[in-house]
């Protein structure tokens, strides 16, 4: 067999990607919301996202030509478009995106599980968790650390302009001056712990607060924990 015949193989692959669910096609409004949450992270490594447009009333009117560069400047690299209508596959292809039909994804399994909610809860009660990621060096401006599927522990300072993300909890045993996003895949029980709270932005399961809202003196520069309560961020000094 010639060497050319062994040049590559085709195998099945499963990628676990974050999805950006758009709730508006107003790009000015979306740009403001993205700035509030991410700022300009064009120097940071881009994170691959699936662009979910199922919630838009007229997804074909979405200006992807403007949207994709807008997302890229925030460190969001759209790799696929998701919607139940196959007609959008041509739109996705026009902009170099893959197309994922959300109607073809296994939702029937969820419906079948509804008559037996106890079994569903029990099976979901003990998900396989990834090992805790430990970072023992400073996270500098423009850097992004992501602990996929687990907790993140940072033993040094998170500088302004840096971003730490975890699907679980985030522990920063030094000043937290950048952005911290815990529960990135929707874990409402996730928490953020910081030795010195000075963050530009904190977020848990998509609920966020930016530096534009001044931190109260009770936690500014002090050991702090952050958690969700009734869909609102609660920030309290540790030990209180």
Swiss-Prot record:
InterPro entries: CAP/MinC_C, MinC, MinC_C_sf, MinC_N, Septum_form_inhib_MinC_C. It comes from the Bacteria. One of its GO terms (biological process) is regulation of cell division. Coiled coil: none annotated. The keyword Cell cycle applies. Interacts with MinD and FtsZ. Belongs to the MinC family. PANTHER family: SEPTUM SITE-DETERMINING PROTEIN MINC. This is Probable septum site-determining protein MinC. The lineage of its organism: Bacteria, Pseudomonadati, Pseudomonadota, Betaproteobacteria, Neisseriales.
